[in-house]
Amino acid sequence: MEAVHNTPMMKQYFSIKADYPDAFLFYRLGDFYELFFEDAKQVAHELELTLTAKNGKNAEHPIPMCGVPHHAANGYIEQLIERGYKVALCDQVEDPKLTKGLVKREVVQVITPGTLMSSLTEKENRYLVAVVEQDGRFGIARGDVSTGESALTSVATLDAVAKELSIILPREIVVTSSEHEAALSHLQIPLTQSTRRETHPHGDRAIDAAQADAFAVLYAYMHDTQKRSLAHLQPAIVYEAADFMQLEPNTVKNLELVRSARTGDKKGSLLGLLDVTGTAMGGRMLKRWLEKPLLSQHTIAERLDAVEELLAHYFERQQLKDTLREVYDLERLVAKVGYGTASARDLVQLKSTLRLIPRIQAALEELFSDRLGQLALGLDPHDELTDLLDRAFVEAPPISTKDGGMIRTGFDPALDELLVASKDGKTWLATLEASERQATGIKTLKIGYNRVFGYYIEVSRANAKLLPEGRYERKQTLANAERYVTPELKEKEALILGAEEKSITLEYELFCQVRDQVKTHIESLQRVSRRIAELDVLVALAETAERHDYVRPVTLTGRNVMIENGRHPVIETVLPRGEYVANGINLNEDREMLLITGPNMSGKSTYMRQFALIALLHQIGSFVPASRAELPIFDQIFTRIGAADDLVSGQSTFMVEMVETQEALTRATDRSLILLDEIGRGTSTYDGMALAQAIVEHIAEHVGAKTLFSTHYHELTVLEDSMPRLANVHVRAVEQDGRVVFLHEVRDGKADQSYGIHVARLADLPDALIARAEVLLSEFEQTEERTVVSPKEPVVQAEPVDQLSLFAETDPVRETVQTLDLINMTPLEALNTLYRLQAEARK
């Protein structure tokens, strides 16, 4: 190995890198972060950087190297993190000016997908999750380093873990075993193995062993990667699945709660519609409310009361809206204080937010709901802290905390003296520049400064000859200029720079002292942040209710449902006002299941989603899009809507249908809501119809959940005669001039026809094809009649030849063909065998 590999610096590099084998080591050298060896090769490839060699490309053993400027490193690091990598940030931890020999370096932070603090989406959390198995349960601990929020739960199976994580959508998962890593790899979220534990207070609520262990792993990983105090980490919220309405991941997706299924964006989702929050923390809280609807009738009523009160008081609501728009992201500002990265600008923003609290309280004085009153009482304006921040900092401090200019005059007498000395020195420099110009006659003469040479007098090379000899000492020659110093300038430079350096050092010390004082208020500031966030969400729900003419739903203790003129909250907003066709729904003990028929594109799926979204809005404490609504509290919502292959796990549309249906059939209770759309379309006609009927019967007899079941098997509508709690409804369509017109009205009774060929005509299929389809349809209707048997009677059916059933009997002809030895068979034997098979097939 070449000597360069054994230099003190490279030895230091190897020693540090050995502790972080799974991360790219960004090694600080002067104004750059450098990477070496395989790190350099991979990062150069990922970020399209120039790959060089530290000891020259022509060396016998060149050391691959690439680097990025330290002031621009965040952008490069973010790119690597978003691609699932980790970065270990290795900085100089002592002043090179005061060090002889090698500067001490150490890793000051490990940045991972779950702990990235920069480039944060304003209204989204960036969760890190730990999963641990203990005493037969799986503990799930989640935390957001950027906000300090943390929460704990536990579930019984790894499948339940995967479902919970599919709702949380963490950026990184920490597991303690390779078995768990393999089991969760299908989520396609970066996974890290770590077994170190570190205890941390988790709040007052009792937790089980799995939750405690998961939180210990989470905290240890946060501490190991961030390498600093995590004083802002809030006591964990402990919750159980039974505390909230359960939503399957596919339900969140099918109902487009937080993302549009078409674009993957927030716009076009229910969250995109509701989120008119004025604050970042309010937006994040609203998303959490949508993902965890309530089961507590008391809490639902509290929220509805607050929304109703805000809706009734327009001027107070507008005052709150206007004020909330001025509120900074208090949750993340406080987290930065605890994390030790808050700047003076951050502290001024914190002060500005606290100063808004009296305005918020004044608006709330006119509102009398219990929850709004509780929120108002918890809004502590922190007057003493606000006064401290006001006295300490100028209104617009610089971004950097290391260059001065932050502290207000009058805050510290010693600093004021240094600033006066520095200011007087700069006044003296301006006077000197003017007198030197006059003495030399050089109008372009100027006084400048750089870190290497200090203060200097600069003149152009052409004017250098005009300077009198003896007094000016040449310091630096440039292409077009000469730089000089004089005895007076040297003498004053020491005084000026001494005052500047001391003032900057003192400013930073004062800043740190103030920040530490703010740190003692973290817990109370976080309480204020949570209350402002909740108020913001309630104001947003009231604003949405007014904009779109929502009504307050009535919460029922029973299981009946009555909605008049219900509307899909998102779809109605993309149509011209008044064009959305509203529909009602009525379910009770004698009418628990609706069998929905109607043409494709008529609105069956929209009707089903509309009901689910109204139910969900009710359980987050929101008004709903209807003219009247009476709703029970649903414990779960299951959906099987839309055709989608699961390409990752290799499942067909039909298998996805069956898996999602199985979830509903096995987990739903009589307090659940089930939406099943076109079950059976992924297999043959008779298989599909048989399964659809069997599923309807099973739900009615064994589950008892309120169910909307849409189908293209019109034969199933006869079940209404034998199943007393099932009712037929249909989405109306009429035929005009040979074309179908969708009315989107839901009426009792079955649909008279499917209009499939009419829909094909709307899609502009060729006229000849449409004509042929009409002829074939007529023939099929004359030659085949499908029937449905009464529940529990045996089904005798023939299987169509165009598609094999999943449940087909053994085929002897097929078995014979599979066992033929074609390689050793003579042509005559092959012909005789084919003849026998043909005869067998014709039987």
From Swiss-Prot:
Record carries keyword ATP-binding: yes
Pfam families for the chain: MutS_I (PF01624), MutS_II (PF05188), MutS_III (PF05192), MutS_IV (PF05190), MutS_V (PF00488)
GO cellular component: cytosol
Keywords: ATP-binding, DNA damage, DNA repair, DNA-binding, Nucleotide-binding
One GO term of the biological process aspect: mismatch repair
MF terms in GO: ATP binding; ATP-dependent DNA damage sensor activity; damaged DNA binding; mismatched DNA binding
Function: This protein is involved in the repair of mismatches in DNA. It is possible that it carries out the mismatch recognition step. This protein has a weak ATPase activity.
Entry similarity comment: Belongs to the DNA mismatch repair MutS family.
Protein known as: DNA mismatch repair protein MutS
The organism of origin for this protein: Exiguobacterium sibiricum (strain DSM 17290 / CCUG 55495 / CIP 109462 / JCM 13490 / 255-15)
